């Protein structure tokens, strides 16, 4: 039954019957009355067979919907996608404008070799400021700095490490972060601790104490995270998802939105971090110092007129080399430039490290294997124990695409 009368002699009937995709038919159709048609099959339909009917009439018999109706249909079918797309555009625009305002880094200065670290910056602070974030390398550098400064002895046996506090050593040369690590990890003069995850709570507390001290000293003064600028886009992205939930939207729409919006948040959370003008100057100094520590070629060192290598100079800068990732080059340079009197006295013997290697073997070990094994031990010690749609038109059986005279406005 159709909702309007059919013009006599201007109606065409057709049908397709059989299995999916069949072009044949064993059904006939006829017009009954002014608005009814009937189709009769000459034999029963077998399992998995279907009947598709086709009724067509002259164009203009049914009024074509206006633009308003088409727009309403379009919004009903694609409302969720449009709302989410608008949300993404707002989030991106917000982030870009915020980044353009506060997230652009000041222009980097000229980087040239510097023979001293920036004034009053500890190794952990150099790592923290240069990366504008805290990571395990800063914690590793802080412990090695405590050892080099005579506060801690590092004992290694079969890649197992133990830290022993040395009593009576002055604390004046320690940075606030290093003091926080020492007081948390080894609070008493004779404290001793194995770098094992059974002691993870103390290592985690020491790591948090170092992070807190570094944040207090340098965040906001040398660099800014500009985290408040991220809150608005997060609210917009959540609001867009809530509004879109009232419209139709398939899984592909939601998955695409979640992936894109998360990428935007992560990208701009990183890009919004920016050094202050004073911080950019300090970063340039750190990079210049790293250039000096990481230079291996002798001719370049000669042109740089670098200071004469001594055991004292080597040890004082070794924690910085660990912090900046150039410890191998720094240790190899000392092995090559080691003063003759040190070689004649059976090589280098660090007072703060006790392991199975001595002399030149210990020196090469500090550069090659110690960094990775010690960092892995710290990471381990800081962690708790193991802890669809239907067939479209096209005129075949089961397709359902011929009925209603498709397209005949």
Annotate each PLM feature.
Residues 65-73, 239, 253-263, 352-353, ...:
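Extended beta-strand-rich architecture
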Residues 200-205, 209-219, 237-238, 263-409:
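Short hydrophobic helical membrane-anchoring segments positioned at the boundary
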Residues 229-245, 256-265, 290:
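Hydrophobic membrane-spanning alpha-helices of multi-pass integral membrane proteins
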Residues 34-38, 158-162, 321:
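A generic structural signal for beta-strand entry/edge sites
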Residues 23-25, 60-232, 269-315:
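Short, amphipathic alpha-helical interface elements at domain boundaries
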Residues 74-86, 244-263:
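Hydrophobic alpha-helical transmembrane segments
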């Amino acid at each position: 039954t159709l909702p309007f009368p059919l013009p006599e002699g201007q109606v065409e009937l057709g049908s397709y019957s059989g299995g999916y995709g069949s072009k044949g038919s064993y059904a006939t159709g006829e017009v009954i009355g002014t608005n009814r048609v009937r189709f009769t099959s000459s034999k029963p339909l077998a399992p998995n067979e279907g009947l598709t009917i086709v009724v067509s009439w002259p164009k203009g018999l049914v009024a074509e919907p206006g633009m308003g109706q088409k727009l309403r249909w379009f919004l009903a079918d694609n409302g969720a996608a449009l709302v989410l797309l608008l949300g993404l555009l707002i989030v991106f625009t917000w982030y870009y404008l915020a980044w353009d305002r506060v997230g652009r880094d000041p222009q980097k200065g000229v980087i040239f070799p510097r023979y001293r670290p920036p004034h009053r910056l500890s190794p952990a602070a150099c790592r923290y400021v240069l990366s504008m974030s805290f990571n395990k390398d800063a914690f590793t550098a802080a412990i090695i700095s405590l050892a080099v400064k005579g506060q801690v002895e590092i004992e290694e046996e079969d890649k197992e490490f133990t830290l022993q506090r040395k009593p009576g050593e002055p604390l004046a040369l320690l940075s606030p972060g290093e003091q926080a690590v020492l007081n948390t990890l080894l609070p008493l003069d004779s404290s001793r601790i194995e770098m094992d995850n059974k002691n993870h709570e103390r290592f985690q507390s020491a790591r948090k104490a170092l992070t807190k001290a570094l944040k207090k000293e340098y965040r906001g003064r040398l660099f800014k995270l500009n985290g408040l600028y991220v809150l608005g886009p997060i609210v917009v992205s959540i609001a867009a998802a809530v509004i879109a939930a009232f419209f139709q939207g398939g899984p592909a729409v939601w998955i695409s939105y979640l992936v894109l919006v998360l990428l935007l948040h992560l990208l701009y959370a990183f890009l919004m971090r920016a050094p202050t003008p004073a911080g950019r100057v300090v970063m340039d100094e750190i990079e210049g110092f790293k250039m000096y520590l990481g230079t291996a070629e002798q001719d370049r060192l000669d042109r740089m007129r670098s200071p004469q290598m001594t055991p004292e100079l080597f040890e004082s800068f070794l924690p910085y080399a660990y912090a900046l990732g150039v410890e191998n080059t720094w240790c190899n340079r000392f092995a090559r430039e080691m003063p003759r009197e040190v070689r004649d006295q059976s090589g280098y013997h660090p007072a703060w490290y006790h392991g199975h290697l001595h002399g030149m073997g210990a020196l090469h070990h500090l550069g090659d294997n110690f960094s990775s094994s010690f960092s892995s031990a710290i990471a381990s010690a800081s962690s708790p124990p193991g802890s669809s749609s239907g067939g479209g038109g096209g005129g075949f059986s089961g397709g359902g695409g011929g009925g209603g005279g498709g397209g005949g406005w």
